[in-house]
Amino acid sequence: MPPDGLALPTLPVLWHEGECIAIHKPAGWLVHRTGLDAGETRFVVQALRDQIGTPVHPVHRLDKGTSGVLLMALSPAAARQLSAHFERREVHKRYIAMVRGWPADQAHVDHALRPDDAPPQAPAQDAVTDFRLLARCSLDVPVDRYPQTRVALVEALPITGRRHQIRRHLKHLAHPIIGDATHGKGAHNRWWAEHLGVQRLWLHAASLSLPHPQRDGEWLHIASPLSSAALNADWQRLLSEPWQWAQVDARERLLTGLVPAR
């Protein structure tokens, strides 16, 4: 329950058909209860169950700090169907991140990852992510040892689905996500939190595309567009910074949730 008996906000439903539903997960919410976050009060599974009056089954996860599209099932059979698409890598996921520094226009990262809680001798698992630069920003403000603050907006297209894959791959590229307390740098995280008045991980699950669960031969595209102030007010604040867009359609793709060609 939320503190002092306050009601939780309604979770925005992005799509609902048959026994499948997709919602916008706000940053700071856990997908489900866990013993590692005993003091937390905001859980998507329990809140959505109470909101729509039926049990829900998550078929993938987003980190607590990540906002955006979260797909769930309303029955065990639908959960198995959706999970099979993820296992066969038929789900195309698209994320937006604000990172430290100015990365290359494109990057293909094929860097195996060992699970965070695995012993050192455990084998690393294959992990592949494509990155595309969307925009750059430079502010004449010294942070840490740098005379300027440079950040970029990147599109992340994960091919595999390892835990914390995008965050760890961006760290591998030496461009960690702003607000990432584990893989980023505290001085930059603190400066941006104070500058924007928002303390969060700047990672957003912008869209999912997958074979339509109810219509053979069709594809389903679900987006949580950054153009929606109701869903993504903090990102709208970020986008007021002086960004230099890397491609003609980069801003439109970011705002509307349009999917780039792979």
Feature map (PLM): residue ranges:
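Internal amphipathic helical hairpin motif
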Residues: 39-52, 114
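Non-catalytic RNA-recognition surface used by pseudouridine synthases
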Residues: 116-149
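Pseudouridine synthases involved in rRNA/tRNA modification
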Residues: 1-20, 26-32, 169-262
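Residue-level signal for inorganic ion chemistry
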Residues: 24, 71, 97, 131, ...
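Glycine/acidic-rich beta-strand-loop module
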Residues: 54-88
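Short, conserved beta-turn/loop elements at beta-strand boundaries and strand-helix junctions
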Residues: 104-105, 135-141, 171, 213
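N-terminal accessory regions of nucleic-acid-interacting proteins
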Residues: 76-122
